[in-house]
């Protein structure tokens, strides 16, 4: 509990900003969903056949898993708030639509006949009789949609939309329960608070309710517009994959660029896996990110390696990107964050395992746990399987940080790893020698579109200061500080740059 309050004190600024983002995303989605569902619900009361079809479509849309829906939005709308809001609107439609339809249908027919009898036109009957009577039922649907939106909006962080999900994902990535709670508790409180507010609004008279909604809409519009007008100048957006290492290096990029140029850099940590960030770069949702030479050839351009030498692999990756995507990598750093297979030290000693090939001796005793990416990549498990004839059964796939917890608890006994992972040191792991040299070199370098670098040639010099800098040991130690000691990635990055004389 003490650790939670320490984290709260350290990150209160981030908590406030992510909470504001969460509220903005949620309310925009709710307003759009209400603006669509209420008029549509009213129209559907006029025809039973079409109403059933539309209701069924809305119900089907709500059954789509939220992660899948967010993933489907990326090719269509890129990343950020727009696809997140669209996905949330889809989820919010059904309860508002259904309650609007039900509320209007349940209005006493005798009241409608009385309204007709005194000469009320259809629109006036709707606004003066049907909607005021149906409003409590409609507001109940809006309340349900609001709670649903606030909860689902935490997943918006997966596509770079921000919100309290940023803190939750960071906590999962760092294996830090306090960070998870720092995002989860405010999200739950927001759902409760706004449910109470909407419940209070449902008790207002029809006129007061409309006035209150008008004021809320104006406040939201101002809350969105003011920050947009307040932004000045160009801002470079650099993103990082999941994990402490991309966060540290991306913050180094930020510090170096801001130290030597007039540019402002926004860092988006933990935005996802390789394909996600690469697509974000292609669609200009981000300007650049840390990528690795082996990943470029194995996953992005899908070219066979012409050499296993680090320099030649870098040149091949660079030329391949330039030819196929009009992108380029700047100079690479020294460390080689290659894939590896690892076991606990006592397991390795017990079975005399030193190399990947030795695993065939104990294949029946292996309980492998791999990341989804490693298990699926052609330069990951598939390459190991082919080179070593190592066909493993019952492979469990999981998020990167979870596999270390699982092997520490004994649920699995073989994992994929990166050679600079801090957890290798933390959990006393042994990296098995890749005696057939299956894994290519993985040197990290900043990846940008060539067109972006033509607009910002001034960032090349500061970023290239990291050329041939940062050893494997340096990187593992920095990862250890962030992952195990819970130090801030920005501070760790700045301390390293100062220690090496790369900044003042």
From Swiss-Prot:
Keyword field contains Lipoprotein: no
Family classification: In the N-terminal section; belongs to the binding-protein-dependent transport system permease family. In the C-terminal section; belongs to the OsmX family.
Region (Ergothioneine binding domain): 231-504
Source organism of this protein record: Staphylococcus aureus (strain USA300)
Keywords: Hydrolase, Ion transport, Membrane, Nickel, Nickel transport, Transmembrane, Transmembrane helix, Transport
SUPFAM superfamilies for this protein: MetI-like (SSF161098), Periplasmic binding protein-like II (SSF53850)
Any Pfam family the entry gives: BPD_transp_1
Principal location class: membrane
ABC transmembrane type-1 domain boundaries: 19-198
GO cellular component: ATP-binding cassette (ABC) transporter complex
InterPro entries with a match to the protein in the record: ABC_Gly_betaine_transp_sub-bd, ABC_transp_perm/SBD, MetI-like, MetI-like_sf
GO MF annotations, alphabetized: amino acid binding; hydrolase activity; transmembrane transporter activity
GO biological process terms, semicolon-separated: glycine betaine transport; nickel cation transport
Domain note: The transmembrane domain (TMD) and the solute-binding domain (SBD) are fused. SBD binds to ergothioneine.
Protein name, UniProt field: Probable ergothioneine transporter EgtUBC
UniProt-annotated location(s): Membrane
Function: Part of an ABC transporter complex EgtU required for the uptake of ergothioneine (EGT), a natural low-molecular weight (LMW) thiol antioxidant. Responsible for the translocation of the substrate across the membrane. Also contains a C-terminal periplasmic solute-binding domain (SBD) which binds to EGT with sub-micromolar affinity. Probably does not bind L-hercynine.
Subunit description: The complex is probably composed of at least an ATP-binding protein (EgtUA) and a transmembrane protein (EgtUBC).
Membrane topology listed for this record: Multi-pass membrane protein
Transmembrane feature ranges: 25-45, 49-69, 70-90, 145-165, 178-198, 209-229
Chain's gene name: egtUBC
